[in-house]
């Protein structure tokens, strides 16, 4: 069965960095479909200007990979519902959906990391967008994405050494490794509703 890997987390959580190690070396997944990388390829000095075109290219590539039943990975903040239908379609096509969510303690930590990335030549994201995506992503993780994934895990990426917080399977039990952080995440998932 083919695999769809969802590499998720707020802006600055380390998704791309982790993807370049985990996907090819550990999971043997050679297809990483990333709109940010596509945009940077189209317009290296102004990737924001081609975001819509990059999104179209990304969706076309995903459709080709699914038609060919190839393993592939996507990267997302989960801040929108846009991938729920993709996940459902992939499951219908026989894909096994595996989600890894990289968690940071707060939107402030995410903003700090993004600012650091910008200082090193990375792309900028406005603070209000980072904050909205932080809470939106956590809320959607809990309410939309965990319920439709075959396997999922949440990793604390706020520390120097990453820590597994929780993992679970579709409609089955979950194993909580750090209950304090898991409770914090559940509280954060309600922040979007305020």
Description of each model-found segment:
Residues 143-194:
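NTP-dependent small-molecule kinase module
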Residues 95-144:
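A glycine- and Lys/Arg-enriched "phosphate-lid" helix/loop adjacent to the NTP-binding pocket
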Residues 6-9:
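The Walker A (P-loop) glycine that initiates the GxxxxGKT/S ATP-binding motif of P-loop NTPases
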Residues 15:
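Conserved lysine of the Walker
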Residues 1-4, 68-70:
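Pre-Walker A (Motif I) flank of P-loop NTPase domains
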Residues 12:
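Walker A (P-loop) phosphate-binding loop of P-loop NTPases
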Residues 53-104, 137, 153:
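Glycine-rich phosphate-binding loop used to anchor ATP phosphates in small-molecule kinases
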Residues 19-70:
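Conserved substrate/cofactor phosphate-moiety recognition/catalytic segment
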